[in-house]
Amino acid sequence: MSKSWISKRESKLLYILLTTTELYLKTGQPVGSKTLKEYECSNLSTATIRNYFAELEAEGFLKKNHVSGGRIPTDLAFRYYVDHRADFLQDDLPETTIHLLNQLPKESQNIVKDLQKASELLGEALQLPTCFSSPRFENDSVTNIQLSLVDEQRVVVILSTEFGQIFTDTLWLAETSNYASLKRIETFLQNYLRKQPPSETLSQKEEDLGMTLYNEVVVRYLTRYCNFSEEDLYQTGLSKLLKYDAFKDPDMLALGLSFFESRCHMCKLLDIGMHRDRPTAFIGSELSDIFGTPNPHCAVITTPYYMNRTPLGAFGVLGPINLPYREIYKTLTIFADKVKESLTQSFYKFKLSFRRPCPSDPKLSKEPTLLARYSSIKLLPPKETS
């Protein structure tokens, strides 16, 4: 249906479609002609409404529920609804949503952690899984290191940075170790990072092991930090899908989860969303058309976030197709404005900068000078103890 010029009948057909879709979103139940008449179409007979239903069904906008006889909007109907109604922002947001949005982080140098908190608050406000993409922020530095013994010869190393990045890796120990020894090594490395003298005396073997672990994990960290081909992706809140009836079916839940957990899929959608100046919805079969996969029977809505006028990435939410699009669009619009204000202040106050992925630069991981350029951390030379 083209909106450039429509006849009176087409206008009425459009009205029936939008009203039916809106009622379905409110109730979650198939819409019958009698229900629609009582809801908002009192000037039309049920027979006339059924005729409109039949026409919309023939055009692929509605499908019949064989149990109740009511109509259910299709992916095409939801697309039409989103295009014509979703950005009507006159409705007030719930007080709980406003309260959560007011908790968004203010200006800070801990920028990645703040974006993660913002994503958590957005998910709590909308009760949906959330994700966001992020560039790499330059001049970051490691501020803490933690060691956790998996077994006698494996250790998990956790690095945390000034900007809130967390990096973990599992390393193999050439010789067996124990908890007490590993804690002494951890304290030794933490003191090194903070430029403090050692607080405990280590054996030569422990000192050598500490330097080996540190150098190994730093090289791995720098390689991943500096040589990347796509924006960083953060996801949270998958369990929120369980509250929706559409995902009570195990097969539907598996489809939604597998789609949301696909890094390739989510990165592409967030990249599309980052380059648009407003929220963007990807609905049902549109997702299968983009990726050539089975219809995941879910919807993804993205919105870009900015530093001043520069898009840094995008936030996204995933849920069933029958989402409250108007509320989500308004929430995302206000959310993005608040994030933009905070990021802009942070960038100017702390003189932050960032880099985009460089998939076309195969030399990046082979040049130590390039690796070191973007971080203040350094390798431990032999015998360095303070």
From Swiss-Prot:
Belongs to the HrcA family. This is Heat-inducible transcription repressor HrcA. It comes from Chlamydia abortus (strain DSM 27085 / S26/3) (Chlamydophila abortus). GO terms for biological process: negative regulation of DNA-templated transcription. It comes from the Bacteria. Negative regulator of class I heat shock genes (grpE-dnaK-dnaJ and groELS operons). Prevents heat-shock induction of these operons. Keywords: Repressor, Stress response, Transcription, Transcription regulation. The keyword Protein biosynthesis does not apply. SUPFAM superfamilies: GAF domain-like, Winged helix' DNA-binding domain. The keyword Transit peptide does not apply. GO terms for molecular function: DNA binding. InterPro entries: GAF-like_dom_sf, HrcA, HrcA_C, WH-like_DNA-bd_sf, WH_DNA-bd_sf.
